[in-house]
Structures are given as structure tokens and as C-alpha cells.
Amino acid sequence: LITGGNSGIGFFAIINLLKTKNNLYVVIKSELRKNESLKTIEKYFDKNYLSKYLNIIENCDLSNLDNVKKIKDYFISKKIFLDVVVLNAGLQYTGSFYPKVSKQGIELTFAVNHLAHFYLVNILKDLVRDKEESRIIITSSDVHDPNSSGGNIGKKAGLNNLVNFRKKVSGQFLNFNADESYKNSKLCN
């Protein structure tokens, strides 16, 4: 299983995992993203090969925690157990002064980059085979480190002030900073 396979690390992970001739399950946010991904993946593999090994769990926007549960339901309904789970989905909207929120009222960067994966690991752990080779892999970033090239720009990461992860009763976030929110979401991983 892999999340966040549309581009970058996730996309190349999909290409390399498909070469192993194992069943690969890819979580895709929308029909549009599915079509874009397939068009690119088909440059590397023919459709017959993909029909054997590539399985897409579509319309699964990880910002909505209700969708995360649908992933578990998918595997249970098909009686599928997993050997490897790669949690790679990520979201960043640096520079914004206005937060975006999930269906559950959680700041979007934190909802996707941390909470969705945390929840997914916890609800899938019984479906990951108990073998020495089994893995749960979480990709992250070093921007939470103030000594890294990205971490020394803008506000520093720090979990001492978590008010911007969740909407206040008034519906407002306090002093929202998208860059700080991204760094904090990566620090949580």
C-alpha cells in the first residue's frame, strides 16, 4: 500500500514497486488524479501488466478521516493482508495566511501529513503481516530541524503551541502560519 504516489518520491516508489510483480495498492485522492497517474505510469508498463499488479483505491482524500477508514474497509472486504505500507502523502501551502481545514475542522496540512497517516497505521496494523520482512514506512522531511536548509527559513517548528492545528470555538485560527504548520506536521512524523 502506498499513499501520495502522484509525483516525486511516491511516484518513483510506485514505479519501482511495480517492478517486483507484487500486488500494489495505491490510494488516490480523486478521479482526476487517478487519470493523471495512470497516464504517466502507462509510460513505464503496459496495461496488461498493470491490470495484474496495480490496484487503485480511488476517491480517497486523506484530509477527511472518514475516507481513511474506507481504506481499511477495502482491505477487509477483499480479505487482503499487507506486507509493506508506505505513507508518503503530503500537502503544503506555504505562504498562505489563511488556513484550510478538513471536514473534521483540523488544519489541512496537519490533517493530511500527520493525522491521516497516524490513523491509517493504527487501523491497519492488524492487517500488516507479522513477518520479519513487513514494514511500515513513513516518508518525512527535515524541515522541522532548524539547522536544515528548509528548517532555518521562516518560523521554527515546535510543538509547544498547537493552537493552529484545530479550529477554535470562534472558527478562527490564531496567528496562522502555513510554513510553521508544515514544519510542525513533519516534526510529528
Question: Model regions: which residues?
Answer:
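Rossmann-fold NAD(P)H-dependent dehydrogenase/reductase core
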Residues: 1-189
